[in-house]
Amino acid sequence: MYDNVTFHRIIDDFMIQGGDFENNDGSGGYAAQWYGYCNGQAMSDAADCDSETKYTLPDEADNGLFHLPCMVSMAKTSQPNTGGSQFFIMPDDITNHTWLNGVHTVFGQVISGCEHVTTLSQVQTDSNNRPVTPVIITSATVSEE
């Protein structure tokens, strides 16, 4: 799903964001399966959602995990339960980002190579925080270790 997807938003000392497998610009992406939400609204049945591209994830931001260096977190809109396929990774040189705790769901950690995340967080970006030179995930592997 994430092969050849770009990191479309990069902010130094904050995060690198990617996961928009539809448009590679931050405007797309959705949950891979039904979790009971359509564009952030709870629904009892997937048939009530008019499109699979509107499937979203429930917020699980109070799971005991925090926004520390090298953590992976779910990107979403400012509305509850609107996470989809987009995510962001915190570089290892971040300062205090506790304001994200309880708002965005932390669900993973970079176990090895976080210095590369930090290097990516320092690439040149335009006024919209988009990398001037595309930063692409050529291949992604999920591990449940």
Task: Place the predicted regions along the sequence by residue.
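Cyclophilin-like peptidyl-prolyl cis-trans isomerases
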Residues: M1-E145
